[in-house]
Amino acid sequence: MSSNSFGKLFTVTTFGESHGPAIGCVIDGCPPGLALDAAEFGHDLQRRATGKSRHTSARREADEVEILSGVYEGLTTGTPIALLIRNTDQRSKDYANIGQQFRPGHADYSYWHKYGIRDPRGGGRSSARETTMRVAAGVVAKKWLAERFGVTVRGYLSQLGDITPAGFDWSAVEDNPFFWPHAAQVPELEAYMDALRKSGDSVGARVDVVADNVPPGWGEPIYGKLDGELAAALMSINAVKGVEIGDGFASAAQKGTEHRDLLTPQGFASNHAGGILGGISTGQPVVASMVLKPTSSLRLPGPSLDTAGNVVEVVTTGRHDPCVGIRATPIAEAMVAMVLMDQALRHRAQCGDVGTITPRIPGQIDG
């Protein structure tokens, strides 16, 4: 069956194409009584939006949310919440020359062989434009998690090309267009991206997400493990080619004495596992990372094929991001938040009455 829906109890279905008249989503399973106003979507949507700096696509969309259902007098009613955003800055003529050509590194070839038809305008359904509605749904999940459990979900760009942060400060993340945690490096990133854009090439990136105050117990072994669903959610984002939970692939070089997260009455001594053991949250910060490939939308010509199998030279015109990772932080946050809300509701449904005599310990030792 088609896979345009996400989640089990907190379910999100997105629809629409990059250059269609609108994009939207239907959120089902949100508990009633959550205060919700259209203006609340603006902050995260603008964090994801294009046209905010010279380092992202020049496409400018207002991204104003219309709430069509599921909210009455400012409160969710428990019925499906339908959200709509109208596309206003499509430039489909930029894609006129590639309607019968396959852009290397894009979903053109695979979509063509699956469906026998594709919408070439801006990538159609495979465009990152679709993630706008994930961010919108993530606003709902973030708010519910914060109000119900005090959970916060925050992300940052942890690598741009071969550049990594020289320091870390959460307060710096929202003060630059890269979501970078070390303010002193922003000029270096600006210069790097200016040179990259001038060359016509692109580059990959890495985004880290941290969810604080997640209670222990969320996750459904065996096939609904929290880390498994986080990995699937992050892998569903455009251009993502790798996901880590906690130390991830670095665990291969670690000894057990290093990787194990010791428990003490004062708290966990470390968090190499990323706050998840056995597929269940431990009460530590949940830490997930994703790596995004360099975009294949390049001004540099490259050989390819057309739908008839003829050799062609493809040059991608239009407005594109030289690094899709720059705008990916709010998307990753949204996916993590939606997984956590879905798992919270599922935990409440099955194990809401479960209690233990074991005291909860802090997620980490203070100091």
Swiss-Prot record:
GO terms for cellular component: cytosol. This reaction introduces a second double bond into the aromatic ring system. It comes from Stenotrophomonas maltophilia (strain K279a). Gene3D superfamilies: Chorismate synthase AroC (3.60.150.10). Pathway: Metabolic intermediate biosynthesis; chorismate biosynthesis; chorismate from D-erythrose 4-phosphate and phosphoenolpyruvate: step 7/7. NCBIfam families: aroC (TIGR00033), PRK05382.1 (NF003793). Its EC number is 4.2.3.5. InterPro entries: Chorismate_synth (IPR000453), Chorismate_synth_AroC_sf (IPR035904), Chorismate_synthase_CS (IPR020541). This is Chorismate synthase. It is an enzyme of class 4 (lyase). It catalyses: 5-O-(1-carboxyvinyl)-3-phosphoshikimate = chorismate + phosphate. CDD domains: Chorismate_synthase (cd07304). Belongs to the chorismate synthase family. Its cofactor is FMNH2. Homotetramer. Keywords: Amino-acid biosynthesis, Aromatic amino acid biosynthesis, FAD, Flavoprotein, FMN, Lyase, NADP. NADP(+) binds at R48, R54. Disulfide bonds: none annotated. One of its GO terms (biological process) is amino acid biosynthetic process. GO terms for molecular function: chorismate synthase activity; FMN binding. FMN binds at R125, S126, S127, N238, A239, G278, K293, P294, T295, S296, S297, R319. Reduced FMN (FMNH(2)). It comes from the Bacteria.
